[in-house]
Amino acid sequence: MSADSADSVPSPRSAFATTLQIVSVVSFTFICYLTIGLPLAVLPGFVHDELGFSAIVAGAAISVQYFATLASRPLAGRCADTLGPKRTVLRGLAACGASGALLLSAFAFARWPAASIGLLVASRLVLGIGESLVGTGAILWGIGRVGTAHNARVISWNGIATYGALAIGAPVGVAISHALIPAVLGMLVIALAALGYYLARLITPVPLVHGERMSYASVLTRVLPHGLGLALGSAGFGSIATFITLYYAARHWPNAALSLTVFGTLFIGARLLFANTIKTHGGFRVAIVSFAFECAGLLMLWLAPVPHVALVGAALTGFGFALIFPALGVEAVALVPPASRGAALSAYSVFLDLSLGITGPLAGYVAGAFGYPQVFLCAAVAAAAGVALSTVLYQRQARLSGSGAAA
């Protein structure tokens, strides 16, 4: 066996060691999203019931975090490229802690609604910045520790940490709020951020990557096709997350929450079991198959005559969506110099933020005009467009590789 072939098949021990290296830093993403998830399901009720504001104000107060995340993506990429991933993560965790302090103050000022809502909005804005810094920094920190050959595994594990923390945080936050008082959530956010900050300081930083740095606008232009693919794939996730419970209710079906659980379980399972296929077969080929699975699942949701069929549809959608972000992300990051990886990752992630922000109101219009099943039909069309786009990108890559080899 040649040295090259031996290196291409890592031993179980080296694979486990690599996973530990990755998990040790994406754990900070888990902590960050735990600080997001814990108050997430509690805050709308607090704003509407305790402070007396309308449901629109409650929704806006929560959603402002996502706009802060979107707006701070360029900052996160620049920090990761110029200050280093570790310092970027530390700044993000500090922002998460500050958001907890502002959240605690918002609960304390509940008797003065205007002051309380102002503090809450400030908390959400700071948390959005922290989310962007930690998410981008943790991925680049992981890549710096294990090498670019494991880009897909790092991105996949970071996604598992993200969605796992949100899935755990929301019900735990509701339970704590009911058992104690909501203000405890602010204290818990501060404590988690402080713990993450302490642990992050103990881990060795990775060297800064020097060399050519592209402008953010140039990076955004270069990763635009990949980002559009991510946006198309995210429409399915956004549709299920927002409308599956209303879809079940309109059909008078029970256990809508089970469909979300199945979606999340298949999502995490696919990332755990199949992340290495991106390295083996290439990002575009994996994306084509992933979009096809997602499209099939969404079509099943559209046509489902009984809950069991809808459940299978949700499962297929979660399985398909799981690898779209890392598959296209690996190809996007490969298009820029090493010194601009942070900018590429943040620019690429912008399309996820935009897609989730746009899907809600657009799908709401479709549901109101044509019914809830048509929401999933539209998302299936988006996934089918993702298949076509990924196929075009794969063929273009093959042509460029062929011309390069011929030269």
Swiss-Prot record:
Q: Which cysteines are cross-linked by disulfides?
A: none
Cell location: Cell inner membrane
- Does Cell membrane show up as a keyword for this record? yes
Q: Does the keyword Secreted apply?
A: no
What is the predominant subcellular site recorded for this chain? membrane
Q: Where are the transmembrane segments?
A: 22-42, 51-71, 101-121, 126-146, 154-174, 179-199, 227-247, 258-278, 286-306, 309-329, 347-367, 369-389
Q: Which Pfam families match?
A: MFS_1 (PF07690)
- What keywords sit in the KW lines? Cell inner membrane, Cell membrane, Membrane, Transmembrane, Transmembrane helix, Transport
Q: What is this protein called?
A: Uncharacterized MFS-type transporter BMA2043
Originating organism: Burkholderia mallei (strain ATCC 23344)
